Amino acid sequence: MTLPLLGPMTLSGFAHSWFFLFIFVIAGLIAVYVVLQLARQKRMLRFANMELLESVAPQRPSRFRHIPAMLLALSLVLFTVAMAGPTHDVRIPRNRAVVMLVIDVSQSMRATDVEPNRMVAAQEAAKQFADELTPGINLGLIAYAGTATVLVSPTTNREATKAALDKLQFADRTATGEAIFTALQAIATVGAVIGGGDTPPPARIVLFSDGKETMPTNPDNPKGAYTAARTAKDQGVPISTISFGTPYGFVEINDQRQPVPVDDETMKKVAQLSGGNSYNAATLAELNSVYASLQQQIGYETIRGDASMGWLRLGALVLVAAALAALLINRRLPT
C-alpha cells in the first residue's frame, strides 16, 4: 500500500531479511526495561511509611509513563523493517523492446461503417499509439494485403512510422500468415543488433485487421495465420490482435456491394495460439482505447523496487513522538 507523505509500504520481498534478527535485540531491551521497572518498584516499597513515600515521590500519570518507552521500541521495530529492505512492484518504461505494428490494407478497409472509413481511422489511431508509446521502444510497421511489406524497420524514430502510416495504399487479398512471418523476421533481425542484455529484447506483434484471411484460405496451411501464430508462440512473441469494424460493413467493387463483416473469431484464435490478447473495436474511440491499453501493457515493465523509505519515515515520526511523550509525560527522555 501507499500512504500519503510516507510512500509505498510493503511487508514482502525483503532483500536483507537477516536484519530481522535485530528483533531479538529489541526484545532484550524490552526485557531489561521491564526488569528495571520491577526493581525500581521493589526499591520504592522498602519505605515503611507509605504516607511519607507519597509525599516525597513526584506526581506522575503512572498509567501513561510507559508510553515513551513503548513508542521507542516501536520505532526500533520500524527501523528494523526498513533495514530488512522490503520491496514492491514498480512500473518503469521499457528501454529495450521491439513492437511490430502490422496493419491490414486489403480492400475491405475501404468500408465506411467506421467514419470516415476503416483505413483512415486505423491510421489516426496508429499514429496516436506511436506518439504515446514509451520512447525507448523500437517500433516497426508492416502493411499487408496479398503480400506483406516492411515499411519501417523497428526504430525509436516515431516520425518515420507516422510518415509511413500516411502513405498506406489499398491492395487485394489478405495474407495474414505471411504478415506475421514477416514481422517475426523483422523482430529477429533487429534483436540480433540491439544490445543491453544476454537475451533477445522482449517483442510483441500488434496485428490490426478487419477480415478473414483469404490467402491461403486454410489458416492451418504452412503459410496460414494459425501456423504463423504457433510459430510466434514458439519464439516467445505474443500477438495482440485488434479486429476493427462492424458486422455491417460493405464496399463497392465494380458497382456491386460486397459485405465485409469484421471477423472476430479468426483474430481471437490467432491471439490465443500465440499467447497474446485479442481486442475488438467498432469505433475510432474504441480503437483509441484499445491502443491506450496496449501502450500500458507494452510500454512498461514491472520490477521490484525498494520500499524501505516509507518505513524509515514512519520510524522517524514514531521516534519523535517518543521523545515528545517523554518530555510531556515524564519530563525526561525514556530510560
Swiss-Prot record:
Keyword Ubl conjugation belongs to the record: no
Originating species: Mycobacterium marinum (strain ATCC BAA-535 / M)
Parts of the chain that traverse the membrane: 18-38, 67-87, 309-329
VWFA domain segment(s): 98-294
Keywords, comma-separated and alphabetical: Cell membrane, Membrane, Transmembrane, Transmembrane helix
Similarity-based family: Belongs to the UPF0353 family.
Protein name: UPF0353 protein MMAR_2288
Pfam families associated with the record: VWA_2 (PF13519)
Assigned GO CC terms: plasma membrane
Chief subcellular location: membrane
